[in-house]
Design a protein with these regions (language model features):
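DNA replication initiation on ssDNA origins
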Residues: 1-91
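DNA replication initiation modules
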Residues: 3-25, 78-103, 136-190
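Hydrophobic, Leu/Ile/Phe/Ala-enriched alpha-helical segments that form helix-helix packing faces
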Residues: 54-60, 112-116, 151-159
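Intrinsically disordered, low-complexity regulatory regions enriched in Ser/Pro/Gly/Thr
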Residues: 86-87, 113-114, 125
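Short amphipathic alpha-helix segments
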Residues: 100-118
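Short beta-strand
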Residues: 120-126, 164-169
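A generic structural motif
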Residues: 128-135
């Protein structure tokens, strides 16, 4: 994965699955390298679960299998997985780009790898989307929605796409994925 960022800079939460609302089974405050390394290497059985999701024959089966994945709260530290549970922001925003062709995803990946504020991106669990972690200068919980919309607008203007609107919610979890070609820029700037 290369150079690690200052681990004290970006503290986030990981949860065992979508139902783990109080973060009982994983370290409460982890550095971003823990989920990023898992995404890149497929450890903790993640690669096998992602292969099963990508090879599922129906959307219902894919959705059911996704429920067993770890979820990451890139937005910050939460005592509970709801908006009132956020105690501090990481300054990170996760943009979720869904249902794109391989050609479109390749173009987006190539373009955003040159954007200095993109910290990381990786294929979504379904394989036809992209999760993009953007560094911002916002540490104010009340301003998260506005910050998200500004980042979202950058993607809309650049690619003519509308990222998943659910991610505007402060407590929206991100399913972990597997992508050995994950992009990581430890020197991303707001």
């Amino acid at each position: 994965m290369g150079v690690l960022v200052n681990s004290n800079l970006f503290k986030i939460n990981m949860f065992k699955n979508i139902w783990d609302i109080e973060n009982q089974d994983l370290e409460k405050n982890c550095c971003i390298e823990i989920p990023l390394l898992a995404i890149q290497t497929g450890t903790y059985g993640i690669a096998e679960k992602i292969y099963a999701i990508r090879n599922a024959v129906s959307k219902e089966e894919r959705d059911r299998l996704k429920l067993s994945l770890f979820v990451v709260m890139w937005q910050g530290i939460f005592t509970r997985k709801n908006n009132n549970g956020c105690v501090s922001l990481s300054s990170l925003v996760c943009i979720d780009i869904d249902h794109q062709t391989k050609q479109d995803l390749d173009y987006i990946r190539q373009t955003i790898s040159g954007w200095p504020f993109v910290l990381a991106f990786f294929r979504s669990p379904s394989g036809d989307g992209l999760k993009v972690i953007v560094r911002t200068d916002n540490y104010i919980i009340a301003d998260y929605g506005n910050c998200y919309r500004q980042v979202e607008q950058l993607f809309t203007d650049a690619f003519g796409i509308k990222p998943d609107k659910l991610c505007e919610d402060l407590s929206h979890p991100c399913f972990i994925s597997y992508d050995p070609d994950m992009y990581y820029n430890p020197y991303a700037v707001p």
